[in-house]
Amino acid sequence: YLMPDFNDPIFLDYQEKLVTELGKRYNGNPNIAYVDIGNMGTWGEGHTYTSGVMYSQDTAKRCIDMYADNFPDTHLFVINLTQHYAQLEDYCIERGIGWRNDSFWVSSPQLYTYQSQYDKYWKTNPINMEAQHWERLQGWNEDETLAAFSDIHPSYFGLQWYIGNLMDGYRSFVERAAKRVGYRFLPETVSITNKTRAHGYIELN
């Protein structure tokens, strides 16, 4: 893979111009659930796996700022940038940016939570969790995987595989996993003080 010099000021200036225009057009768009800060590293995933040449912390911070400044009304996720520069974790949290891992369990079950990052983010900021390609992980311990969901508290979760094949073989797991993602409010009791006639209507606010 060919990769740019991510620290090059000309490269960064043009990136910032692009992100600024994207923000003008798409910030706050109700059809966009979130935007990844994915302009750095191999495949936009923050790491430099294919070259081994890392960008600087100042460059990483500038990339975070250009998105946070131009998408103030859209959920943002940072991908692996803070894995390399832990000092930026608190900065991202302060700016309301969520954390996305691409991908969990890609190396080994022992790395399935990236616990330090998730622990810092999930209580105040959203988590976006993506799994290793499913065909490489058949034979997962489903209960252990669901336990990871409880630890990580994801608001979004992506399984990388053809949905038909996945649902044919693992529908029960997918349905159980879906119940661990996001938030569900289940009222135990409801008290209604308004009165109405039989078959009438009560307005709830």
Write out the residue ranges for each language-model feature:
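Surface beta-strand/loop "capping" patches
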Residues: 176-205
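Extended substrate-binding grooves/exosites of carbohydrate-active enzymes
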Residues: 158-186
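Short, solvent-exposed linear motifs at loop/edge-of-secondary-structure regions
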Residues: 28-37, 41, 199-205
